[in-house]
UniProtKB/Swiss-Prot annotation:
Residues that span the membrane, as ranges: none
Stretches assigned to coiled coil: none
Record HAMAP family: UPF0398
SUPFAM superfamilies xrefs: MCP/YpsA-like (SSF102405)
Similarity section: Belongs to the UPF0398 family.
Organism: Streptococcus equi subsp. zooepidemicus (strain H70)
Name the record gives this protein: UPF0398 protein SZO_03970
Database matches in Pfam families: YpsA
Amino acid sequence: MTAILVTGYRSFELGIFSEKDKRVAIIKKAIKRDLIAYLEEGVDWFIFTGNLGFEQWALEVANDLKKTYPLKTATIFAFETHGSTWNDRNQQQLQQFRATDFVKYSYPSYESPKQLKSYHHFLIHNTDGAYLFYDSEHETRLSYLVAAMKEQPCYPLSFLSFERLNDIADE
């Protein structure tokens, strides 16, 4: 079994506030190419943390690919309360994560920063690599997870870059 953690920018961090934004189609096109490459290398699980934006789009692509490839998806939330304050539209999108093949949460609710560090450790040590849409020049709180990943000597990281998205848009 090979499991890849999929994470990246949230939609608001990219300035995307509608699924009709033309950038979403470009991002999904890149995701599809990359997920197919992973599947052809033998990956059979894609693991998500339940964030809207890149993860949501990757989950949608993975669900479409299930028609052709034998893959599984999982969501491991940091907290059981993840998304509890989101609006109705976002709650509906959150349901996609709750409908994956495997769903768990690490903690009932947030109590201290140590929980997030432990959660990151768990994700890294229970996956075989990560697929990220993240650029260190455009930092978000995802930087903590990326830094923890980079500390692992044999933890492969694959990044989707803004440059690559521009190339796909130009096709």
